[in-house]
Amino acid sequence: MNKNKAIRENKMRKDIINYLIDFPLFDALKGNQLNIVAEHMNYYEIDKGEILFKEGDKGDYICFVLDGVIDVLKKSVTGDSIVISVLPKGRSFGEMSILDNFPRSATAKARTKSSFLTLNQMGFDTILKDYPQIGITILKGISRILSQNLRQTSSRLADYILPIA
């Protein structure tokens, strides 16, 4: 029945809003703004060992870990996969993909059974067009996350290279 479907969808949207509150990317959004974002989210569950996406795949969505642990892997020059990041509940990844439409720069694989939300490029573009203030807030949050990631990567890299001077 349509009424039951509407009730399920409404409950799922409320659940998604409750999940979004836990992510720093959305901490500046309130009430109806979170509802608008939730309308563009999709929920997924995957088993341990499952690949979410591979390095080189088309990137058009950002992921938000709700439960479980995701490994981010990068191929080395020898072709081996190296874990470059371990992402637990409350972390997001794939932020660059909704900004630049470039292929994925790494592989994401479930270390444990996991659940996550996604926001795809089309949904994000709709939010930007129809609700520019919400879109700008999300863009600022993505910029903050990417900046933090770059700082961490620079710090880790500095530990492995010799000083030039």
Regions found by a protein language model. Give the residues of each.
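Cytosolic regulatory regions built on CNB/CRP/Popeye-like sensor folds
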Residues: 1-165
